[in-house]
Structures are given as C-alpha cells and as structure tokens.
C-alpha cells in the first residue's frame, strides 16, 4: 500500500519531481509538477497515456498560470463566463501563450485549467503555490478510481504517496469547455 502523505510531504514530493495521488471532485487523480517535463513524462508512463492528448491543470489561483496563458485573446464576455464558474467543477481550455510547455498542451494550442472548489485540492495547490497536473488515477482506457481502495494496485509502486481524503461526490469527472468558443468538449 502506498504511503499516506501530509500536505507538506506532498509538496516535497512534487518539488522532487514525484507523482502523487489525491482525491478530486469526482475521482482520484494523479498529479505532478507541470514545470518538470521529466515528472510529466513519468506520470504519462504510469498511466500509459499518449503525450499528445494534453493534460488538465488544477489550481487554487489563476495567477499561478499567468505566464502560460494568453487571456487577452478572450472576449470580455467569455472571460467573465469562465471566471464566474470558478472555483468549481468546471475545466476550461484557455488560450495558451507561447511559453506554455508542450508536454502539457500536447497537440493543442490551449491549456485545460480548473480552479477547484474541492477543499483538499485547493489546500494542496495553496500549499504548493502552483498548479499541478490533474489526470484520473487509472491506466488509460480503464475506469477511474472513485475511492482510495479502488486505486489500481499496479499504479501504487510508482507513486511517492497518496494525499488521503474523500472525493467531492460528483457522479462524473468535471466538464471541459473551450473558453474561446464555449463548445462543450466533455460533459
């Protein structure tokens, strides 16, 4: 069984380029430091996920991502719609700046971002003072874990540990919408 981490221990693990598991709004997630390309590739290898798909970033404050975003290209109405939905279970694909790492955007020109209202996710991001990768804690193509005890045992040896707590109780993973068009990409 993987080690249970305090928030402080989780921050240390993230700083060291490790991958952690933590509960999100609906399912358990895997996370790492989005600034460390090696950490992101480790996470993708654990999940057996293609790198071109792009990844979601979860944060407590949008300003942690200001260098990677080009919000000036959004209309005031679209930006207001995005900001009014946060914090909450809504992921938006925002226009990425040229500084956004390709290992996060994949083959896309946007950055998928959620400002979470989940107390543990928000506390982790605040303690970390940065966004973190948020992808479901499962091997690609397999169902995501809704409870800690449902985490795939094959993932556990590759994790620095688990930040324990309940999921937010949503029936489905968060919706994903394109902030530029308003189109729903995932319900």
Swiss-Prot record:
Where it sits in the cell: the answer is: Cytoplasm
Key words of the record: ATP-binding, Cytoplasm, Nucleotide-binding, Nucleotidyltransferase, Transferase, tRNA processing
In the record, which residues are listed under signal peptide? none
Keyword tRNA processing included in the entry's annotation: yes
MF terms from GO for this chain are: ATP binding; double-stranded RNA binding; L-threonylcarbamoyladenylate synthase; tRNA binding
For this protein, the record's InterPro entries field holds: DHBP_synth_RibB-like_a/b_dom, Sua5-like_dom, TC-AMP_synthase, TC-AMP_synthase_SUA5
Q: Which reaction does it catalyse?
A: L-threonine + hydrogencarbonate + ATP = L-threonylcarbamoyladenylate + diphosphate + H2O
Q: Name one GO biological process term.
A: tRNA threonylcarbamoyladenosine modification
Q: Which gene encodes it?
A: tsaC
Cellular component GO terms held in the UniProt record: cytoplasm
Name the job this protein performs.
Answer: Required for the formation of a threonylcarbamoyl group on adenosine at position 37 (t(6)A37) in tRNAs that read codons beginning with adenine. Catalyzes the conversion of L-threonine, HCO(3)(-)/CO(2) and ATP to give threonylcarbamoyl-AMP (TC-AMP) as the acyladenylate intermediate, with the release of diphosphate.
> What family is this?
Belongs to the SUA5 family. TsaC subfamily.
**Pfam families cross-referenced by the UniProt entry:** Sua5_yciO_yrdC
Q: Name all YrdC-like domain ranges.
A: 4-187
Is Metal-binding given among the entry's keywords? no
Q: What's this protein's name?
A: Threonylcarbamoyl-AMP synthase
Which EC numbers characterise this protein's activity in its record? Answer: 2.7.7.87
């Amino acid at each position: 069984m993987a080690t249970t981490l305090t928030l402080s221990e989780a921050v240390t693990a993230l700083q060291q380029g490790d991958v952690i598991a933590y509960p999100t709004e609906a399912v358990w997630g895997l996370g790492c430091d989005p600034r460390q390309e090696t950490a992101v590739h480790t996470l993708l290898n654990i999940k057996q996920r293609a790198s071109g798909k792009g990844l979601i970033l979860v944060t407590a404050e949008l300003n942690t991502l200001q260098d990677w975003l080009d919000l000036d290209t959004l209309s005031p109405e679209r930006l207001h719609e995005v900001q009014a939905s946060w914090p909450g279970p809504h992921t938006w694909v925002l226009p990425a700046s040229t500084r956004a790492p390709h290992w996060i955007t994949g083959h896309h020109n946007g950055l998928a971002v959620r400002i979470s209202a989940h107390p543990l996710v928000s506390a982790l991001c605040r303690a970390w003072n940065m966004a973190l990768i948020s992808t479901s804690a499962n091997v690609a193509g397999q169902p995501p874990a809704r409870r800690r005890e449902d985490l795939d045992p094959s993932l556990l040896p590759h994790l620095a540990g688990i930040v324990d707590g309940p999921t937010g109780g949503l029936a489905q993973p968060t919706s994903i919408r394109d902030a530029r068009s308003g189109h729903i990409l995932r319900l």
